[in-house]
Amino acid sequence: MARQVICWCFTLNNPLSPLSLHELMKYLVYQREQGEAGNIHFQGYIEMKKRTSLAGMKKLIPGAHFEKRRGTQGEARAYAMKEDTRLEGPWEYGEFIPTIEDKLREVMNDMKITGKRPIEYIEECCNTYDKSASTLREFRGELKKKKAIISWELQRKPWMDEVDTLLQERDGRRIIWVYGPQGGEGKTSYAKHLVKTRDAFYSTGGKTADIAFAWDHQELVLFDFPRSFEEYVNYGVIEQLKNGIIQSGKYQSVIKYSDYVEVIVFANFTPRSGMFSDDRIVYVYA
C-alpha cells in the first residue's frame, strides 16, 4: 500500500498498554474488543493531520494492522465503537469533525456549492480523489463553462439575422462563411451566443485529430479563426465535419457519424481559392 492517506482503520492484537493521541494525529478513537475466536485486540480509527504512508503509521503504533479507510468517515468511526464485540471503551481523543461524505456524488454536490477545486478534496475525501480525480476536474470544467456561458450577452447586428434565417433552412451540404475584414463586427460574440443557445461546438482550429476527438456529435459546428490563423486553416476538417463523418484517431481510433451537421466559419478573411466548391459556400458579410 504505497499511497499516503489521511484516514486509517487499524487492529492491534494482544495490546499491552493504552493508546494516546500522537501530535501527528487529528483524531483517534478505539476500543478493546474480543473477536469470535477469542482474541483480544484494539479496534480503532485515526484521522491524521497530513497524508501519511503505511510505514509511517506502523511507526506510530508498532504491531498494528492498518488499512486505509474505504467507507465514509461516520462508518469508520461507528465500526471502531460497535457494541457487540466491545470489552472496554471506546476512548476518543482529539475532535471528530464530520465532513462531507467521501463519495463522488457528495463531492460533486459540494463543488457546486463551494466552488472548490478538486485538489482541495485530497485530504478530507481522499478515497474519492484517489479514484476520481480526472472526473472531478472534468466536472469542475463543466461548472466553469456553465458559469461563463450564463454571463455571455449579445449586442445584435443586422448580419446576425441573416445567419439566423439560414439556420432555419437546415442545409447540411453548405458552409456558412461569415466574413468581417475589419474586426469588431461581433463575430465571436455571436459564436458565443450560438454556443449558449444551441449547444454549438466551438473551435479556433487545429489538428484534425484534436478537433475530431473534441467534437461530440453537435449538429452546429463553429470555427472562429483569429486573423493570424489565415495561413493555417485546416480546410480538410471543415469539409469532413460538413459531411457528417470524421475519423478520430486520438487515444482510440473511432469514426464519428452524424446525419446532419451545419458548419459556420467566422473569419477576417475569405477561404483560399479552390478549397471548397462554389456551390457549397454561402457568404454572410458582417
From Swiss-Prot:
It is found in: Host nucleus. A motif (Nuclear localization signal) lies at residues 50-70, 96-102. One of its GO terms (biological process) is DNA replication. A motif (RCR-1) lies at residues 9-12. Pfam families: RNA_helicase, Viral_Rep. The active site is at Y79. GO terms for molecular function: ATP binding; ATP hydrolysis activity; DNA binding; endonuclease activity; metal ion binding; nucleotidyltransferase activity; RNA binding; RNA helicase activity. Essential for the replication of all genomic viral ssDNA (trans-replication). The closed circular ssDNA genome is first converted to a superhelical dsDNA. Rep binds a specific hairpin at the genome origin of replication. Introduces an endonucleolytic nick within the conserved sequence 5'-A[GT]TATTAC-3' in the intergenic region of the genome, thereby initiating the rolling circle replication (RCR). Following cleavage, binds covalently to the 5'-phosphate of DNA as a tyrosyl ester. The cleavage gives rise to a free 3'-OH that serves as a primer for the cellular DNA polymerase. It catalyses: ATP + H2O = ADP + phosphate + H(+). A divalent metal cation binds at E33, H41, D84. Its cofactor is Mg(2+); Mn(2+). Keywords: ATP-binding, Covalent protein-DNA linkage, DNA replication, DNA-binding, Endonuclease, Helicase, Host nucleus, Hydrolase, Metal-binding, Multifunctional enzyme, Nuclease, Nucleotide-binding, Nucleotidyltransferase, Transferase. A motif (RCR-3) lies at residues 79-82. Homooligomer (Potential). Rep binds to repeated DNA motifs (iterons). This is Master replication protein. ATP binds at G180, P181, Q182, G183, G184, E185, G186, K187, T188. A motif (RCR-2) lies at residues 41-43. There are 3 rolling circle replication (RCR) motifs. RCR-2 is probably involved in metal coordination. RCR-3 is required for phosphodiester bond cleavage for initiation of RCR. GO terms for cellular component: host cell nucleus. Its EC number is 2.7.7.-, 3.1.21.-, 3.6.1.-.
